[in-house]
Amino acid sequence: MALEDMEKKYRISDIARELQVSPQEVLLFVKQEGGRVASTSSMVGEEIHGLIFGHFSVEKKMVDETKKIRAEKEKRLSRLEEQSRKTYEKEQHLSETLSPPAPPLVVVHEPKKEVIVAAPIENIPEPPSKPLEIPVAETPASEEPDAPPAVTELIEQPVVIEQQPLAPVSDAPVPPVIIELPVPSEVPESQVLPESRVLPESQVLSESPLLPEPPVLSEPQEQQELPELPELPEIPALPEPAPKKEEPSVNEHLVSFDAPQMMGGLTVLGTLDMQAGRHKKNRKKNFQEQADALKDEFEPKPAEESRVEEKVVVAKKPPVKAAADVKPKPVVADSSSSAKKKGKKKKKPAVDDKVISANIQKTISGIDDRSSTGSRQKFRKMRRNEREREHEEDEAFREAQRLVVRVTEYASPHELAELMGITAKDIIQKCFALGKFVTINQRLDKESIELIALEFGFEAEFISEVEATAVIVTEDAEADMQTRPPVVTIMGHVDHGKTSLLDYIRNSKVVAGESGGITQHIGAYEVTVEGDRKITFLDTPGHEAFTAMRARGAQVTDIVILVVAADDSVMPQTIEAINHAKAAGVPIVVALNKIDKVEANPEKIKTQLSEAGVLVEEWGGVYQCQEISAKKGIGIAELMEKVLTEAEMRELRGNYSREVPASGIIVESELDKGKGVISTVLVQRGILKVGDPFVAGNTMGKVRALMDERGKRIPFANPSQPVRVLGFEDLPQSGDALTVMVTDREARDLAQKRQVIRREHDFRRSTRVKLDSIARQIKEGLMKELSVIIKADTDGSIQALADGLMKIQNEEVKVQIIHQGVGQITETDVLLAAASDAIIIGFRVRPNVNAKKLAEKEDLDVRFYSVIYHVLEDVEKALEGMLSPELHEESLGSLEIRQIFKVPKIGNVGGCYMLEGKMFRDSKVRLLRDGVQIYEGQLAALKRFKDDVKEVDAGYECGMSLKNYDDIKVGDIVEAYKIVEKKRKL
C-alpha cells in the first residue's frame, strides 16, 4: 500500500467539534491554506490537520483547560458520591446493631480464684471459626447455692486489668473493655465460686441486644452515667427468655451474688452513647473527617483485635475432667431467638437505592440542607476561588491592554517615548545598548520598535497613519438626530441590467455614456420618489475586476438591491455581491430583471439564490423579491416601495446639526484639467458647507464648491446626500474618510503628519522590495517582469486595473507596476517609461502633444484602451509570450540495420532499411537494441548508393553512420525525432 493510502484522514466537522469552533471557520481556513475541500464533511490529511491545530492553538489550549477542569470536577464529585454511599451504609449498619449500652464487664478477685464476666463478642467483625464452648455442670434446681457444682474454665493467663480502689472517676482515659471489681474481705466463702467461671451470654444479653465492643473514651464529660452503679448487681436476676436444661444451674449461681457484696469494689468508669457522639462529631467535622471518624469508630483497633483474639483463645481451652457429666454447650446455643430477631431487624432497614441516589444528587448539587457544614464550606470556598480566578483574569486582561502600545510602523524615539510614558533619553540609551545609533527624530523600523517595547515591558501593535491620527468624534445629541434618506447600492453581474434600472429610475441615459455599455465607475445619484421621499443610489461595476469598488459600495450602504437577469443564471459576481452584503450586515432586496423576455425563468433564479443562501419571502425566507423589467418599467414602483419599507424598518437617522463637524466617505475621485481634483463624497454625519477645511487620507483642502451629480452647484450637503467636492490639494484615494476640521492649520498639520509617515513607509518598502527581489533572483533564477505605467481618468479605475493586472502572474512572469496616476500622459511618464523599459497604458486618457512626440522619439509602446477587458487580455498575451515555451518530442521515422560494413578511417557503417517515416540528415537519433536505448546523438553520414542525401523515405535502403559511436550491430533500430516548442498558457 502506498504511503498516501496509509495516511490518516480527519473530517473537518470532527476537528471543529474537538476545537469547539465553527466548522465554517475551519473550512475557510483550510481553503485559504490551499486545501481542496468542498464542505465540512470533507476529509483532510495529517499536514492540514497540523496546520489547523497550529492556527487554532488558543482554542485548543482553552479546550484542554476545560477538559482538565471537568475531569477534576468529576473526580471530586465521584469522591463525594463514594463518601456519601459509605456514610449511608455505616448509618444503616449502626441502626441495625446500635442499642442502649450493655453493663460494663465485672471481674471479681480473691486470693486464688477470680470471676470474669466477659463482654459479648458475637458481633466482632472477625467471628471465630468455631462457636465458643463452655462446659457447665448440671445440678438440680433444689440444691442449695452454698455448695454448687464447679463450673470451671481453665485460664492459663487471665486477662485482668490492674486492681484499683473505689474512687471518684478521674479525668484520665481508661480502656472500658474490662472493668475491675475488688472483692471485699467479708464476703463468705459460700458466696464465692470455687473456681473462675464465665457467665453465659444468654444471661448477660437477655435484656439488651448485642453491641460491638465500644472504643476508648476520649472525652471525660461522657462519664456522667456513674449513678447507674447500684443497678449492676441486679444483672443475675434477669429473667431468661427461653431457658434450656443446663441453664437453671447457671442461673442459681448468678443469684448467689448479692448487691451489698458487690458494692464494695465496683468501679464504673463510664458509658458510651454512640448516638450522641456521632451527632457531636457531625457538628464539628466536615464531610471527609466525618467519614474517616465513622470508619475508625466501627472498625476495631489493632489493640482491641488482639485482646479479643486472646479472649477467644481462652474460651477454647478444654474443661477440667472433674465434672465428667457436663455437656459442652456453645455460647450462642441460646441465641436462636435472638438470631431470629436479628434476621427480622436486618430486613427492616434494608438499603434503598432510591435513597442513596437522592443523597448523591443532593451532595452533588450542594442543596442538601442536612449535609455537613464542611461540604457547604467547601462548596462556598470553591465558588469563591472561581470568582477570584475570574477577577484575576479580568485584571490580567486589563493590565495587558494597558501594556499594549498602538504605534505606526516608522515612529521616532520621541513619539514612542510619549506613548510608553518614558523619556526619549531612555529609548536612545536602550538603542545604544542594543547596538543601534539613533537620534531623537530618526525613524525606527518595525523590528526595532518591537524590540524596544519588549525591553520596557510593552507589546507593540502597529496601526496605519490614518488610525494613528484619527480625529476624536463626539457623541451625537438626540435632539440633532433626524430621519435620513436610505443609501441603496445596486449590485449584480455584468450586463444584468443594473445601470438600466437606475436609468429608468433617474430618467436618464447613464449607459449611453459608458464605454462598451458596461459601468466602469462607481456612481452616486440622489432620486426623489413618491413625492418628496429621497433615495441615494450607488451604481457599482459588475465586472470581476471591480471587486474593490463593490466592497466599498457595500460598506457605506444601508440596503442592497441585487439585480439578477431572469433569462440568465446566478453568476460568480452575483455570489460575490451577496457575500459583500452579508459581510457588511445590510439587508438584500432581490430584483429579477428582464422578466419581459420569453426565455425568462424566475423560479430557476430563486432556486439558485436559495442554494447561495438567499431565500426569498415567497419560499419562507426573509429576503424580499420583485420581478421587474428595467426597459419597460414593469415592477419598478413595487421595488421602490419595498426599498422604502426596508428603510423604515431600519429606522435610519442622521445628525443634521450645523455645529457638528461634517464627515463622509470618498466614493470616487478624478482629475479634471480645468477644475483640478474632483471627488464624489457621500456625507454621513453633519452638514458639509462651502468653505469648510477638511482632511481626507493623506491630503487636505478647503471646500471651494459643491455640485450634485448633474453638475449643479449647491450651498451645502446633508447626511446621505452624494456631492462632488472641489478643493483638494492632492488626489485622495477611494474609500478615505473625509473629516471637517476647525481651522486650516489643524487640517494641514494632520495631513503633513500622515504624509511623513507614508513617505517613510514607501521609501523603506521600496528599498526592501528591491533587496528582496535581488536575493530571490539570485536564488531562484531571473524572474521575467513586464513593467507598466498606468494612467487613467479616475482613481477607482486605477485600482481596478492594478488589481486585475496583479492577478495575471505565475512563478516565471508577473506584472510590475512602475507608476500609476490620474490624468493625461505627460512627458514625465514617457521619460520614466524609457528609463525603466516599461509600457504605458492609457485608460480613457490621451497624451499631450509633447509627450506623444517624445514617445515616438524614444520608440516606446503606448497603448490606449476604453474597456478594461481589452487591457487584461493584451497584458495576459504579452506575459504568455514571455514564458519559456514547452518542449515536445515529435517522431520522424525509424530504420533497421541489416548489415555492417567496415570502412577504413571511418569505422562501422550500417546498411539499413527504412521502416517508416523519413530520415533527415540533420535529425536527432537514438539507437535501440532489444528495445533498450544505447545511444542518443546525431547522424555522421546518410548515403544512398554512395551519394550523400538529405533525406530517405520509407521503403528505401540507405547507409548511415553515427557521430562518435561505432558499436552498431545487425538488428538495431535507429529512431529519428525532433524537438518542437509549444506556446505556454498562464
From Swiss-Prot:
Q: Which CDD domains match?
A: IF2_eIF5B (cd01887), IF2_mtIF2_II (cd03702), mtIF2_IVc (cd03692)
List the InterPro entries: EF-G-like_DII (IPR053905), IF2_II (IPR044145), IF2_N (IPR006847), P-loop_NTPase (IPR027417), Small_GTP-bd (IPR005225), T_Tr_GTP-bd_dom (IPR000795), TF_IF2_bacterial-like (IPR000178), TIF_IF2 (IPR015760)
**Which residues lie within the region annotated Disordered?**
75-105, 127-148, 185-258, 277-394
Q: Which residues form the tr-type G domain?
A: 483-653
The organism sits in which domain of life?
Bacteria
Positions with biased composition (Low complexity): 185-210, 218-235, 315-338
| G5: region residues | 629-631
Query: Which intervals of the chain are annotated as region G1?
Result: 492-499
Q: What does this protein do?
A: One of the essential components for the initiation of protein synthesis. Protects formylmethionyl-tRNA from spontaneous hydrolysis and promotes its binding to the 30S ribosomal subunits. Also involved in the hydrolysis of GTP during the formation of the 70S ribosomal complex.
Q: What is this protein called?
A: Translation initiation factor IF-2
